[in-house]
């Protein structure tokens, strides 16, 4: 085990899997700066898939990492996730910090060891979004019965192991509500950070709408593509993933797809967009804040984290309109209250009649800076006993 920095406890970091550098991994990267000597435990690791900063830590993997195709098809091993996370040996550590959207919060620690779990979401594919990940008719019997059995077993495990962390941090009030509903536990809300200094409001022409993110079912990018089939407006789509072929088939003629873009290129794309489309119900959502930091308004579904970012500071009247299924202008752009393609199209048409000041939008992203995150999460770590005061 690596040596400790004086004044710091021997800390283990735990993350579900290290197969790409997405929002959760950026939070992990920021958290890891508090614990430069910590070992990093995970179910599966693809070398080179995450930042050099994370890979400077000693990375320890579960038995899943030795299975064929685990680095690319780890989701096939969903029934084994609980056993894999519980197999990680954390007996030699004084404190544990997990960043969890699946099973990381369920690691087993020694009695009395403080464990802070930063929770991005309870397992969405066995709770709220099971119907989207495993829709009726996707599998024939007996596979369908087996899938339901696995999901039910994972729900029981997920709730039972919610008592393992000594402190739970939710990344939004929306996630905190779901933690309370599914796990019966309270949490402290600390919003994730956005590297706002990477983005500046664009001063040039804004000529296209932007749709960006992982091509996953719960993102509902399909709704925006269907909406734009009836809108004569330019659309740029950035990202990739499991739904790539389906989304290409849905896209209207003239849609521009881009993949593998760098952080610098994405910042330029944000700055040239008329608006970012955000049709999914997200636990928090970093991309809307990145867009706003670029002076770009957001057209978002008015549920989940978008209400706390795009809708931050909105009037009660506007939020009530969205809650009732309508469309309303809010400080960060537009919110629509029905998750349908027609609602996206209506919101875009309403947006076309509005104007937004890029610098005002950029100022709305400033409270989500890294410095704010550092101060708030440090206070949690110190109170929980995973970080000594002043260390």
PLM regions and their residue ranges:
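A charged, aromatic-enriched C-terminal amphipathic alpha-helix characteristic of glycosyltransferases
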Residues: 339-342, 346-382
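Nucleotide-activated donor-binding/catalytic signature segment of Leloir-type glycosyltransferases, i.e.
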Residues: 245-267
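Active-site donor-binding segments of glycosyltransferases and PAPS-dependent sulfotransferases
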Residues: 34-105
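Acidic donor-binding loop of glycosyltransferase active sites
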Residues: 271-283, 296-297
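Conserved donor-binding/catalytic core segment of Leloir-type glycosyltransferases
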Residues: 196, 200-236
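Conserved acidic donor-binding segment of nucleotide-sugar-dependent glycosyltransferases
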Residues: 312-341, 350-355
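Short hydrophobic beta-strand element within catalytic cores of glycosyltransferases
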Residues: 297-301, 307-310, 317-319
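Membrane-proximal helix-turn-helix segments that form the acceptor-binding/catalytic region
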Residues: 135-168, 176
């Amino acid at each position: 085990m690596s040596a400790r920095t004086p004044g710091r406890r021997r800390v283990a970091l735990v993350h579900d899997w290290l197969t790409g550098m997405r929002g959760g991994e950026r939070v992990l990267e920021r958290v890891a700066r508090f614990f430069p000597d910590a070992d990093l435990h995970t179910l599966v690791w693809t070398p080179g898939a995450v930042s050099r900063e994370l890979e400077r830590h000693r990375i320890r993997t579960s038995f899943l990492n030795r299975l064929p195709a685990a680095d690319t098809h780890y989701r096939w091993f969903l029934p084994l996730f609980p056993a894999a996370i519980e197999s990680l040996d954390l007996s030699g550590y004084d404190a544990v910090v997990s960043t969890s959207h699946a099973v990381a919060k369920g690691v087993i620690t020694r009695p009395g060891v403080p464990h802070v779990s930063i929770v991005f979401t309870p397992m969405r594919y066995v709770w709220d979004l099971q119907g989207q990940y495993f829709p009726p008719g996707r599998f024939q019997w007996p596979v369908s019965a087996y899938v339901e059995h696995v999901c039910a077993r994972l729900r029981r495990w997920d709730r039972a192991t919610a008592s393992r962390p000594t402190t739970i941090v939710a990344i939004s009030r929306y996630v905190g509500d779901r933690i309370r509903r599914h796990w019966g536990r309270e949490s402290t809300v600390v919003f994730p950070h956005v590297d706002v200094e990477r983005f500046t409001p664009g001063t040039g022409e804004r000529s296209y709408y932007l749709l960006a993110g992982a091509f996953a079912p719960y993102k509902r990018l399909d709704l925006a593509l269907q909406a734009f089939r009836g809108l004569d407006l330019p659309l740029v789509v950035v990202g990739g993933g499991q739904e790539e072929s389906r989304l290409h088939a849905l896209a209207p003629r003239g849609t521009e797809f881009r993949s593998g873009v760098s952080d610098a290129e994405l910042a330029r794309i944000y700055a040239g967009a008329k608006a970012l489309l955000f049709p999914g119900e997200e636990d928090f959502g970093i991309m809307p804040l990145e867009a706003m930091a670029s002076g770009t308004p957001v057209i978002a579904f008015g549920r989940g984290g978008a209400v706390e970012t795009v809708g931050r500071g909105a009037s009660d009247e506007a939020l009530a309109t969205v809650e009732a299924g309508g469309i309303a202008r809010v400080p960060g752009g537009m919110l629509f209250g029905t998750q349908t393609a027609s609602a996206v199209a209506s919101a875009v048409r309403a947006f076309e009649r509005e104007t937004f000041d890029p610098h005002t939008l950029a100022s709305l992203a400033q409270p989500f800076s890294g410095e704010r995150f550092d101060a708030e999460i440090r206070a949690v770590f110190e109170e929980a006993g995973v970080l000594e005061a002043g260390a």
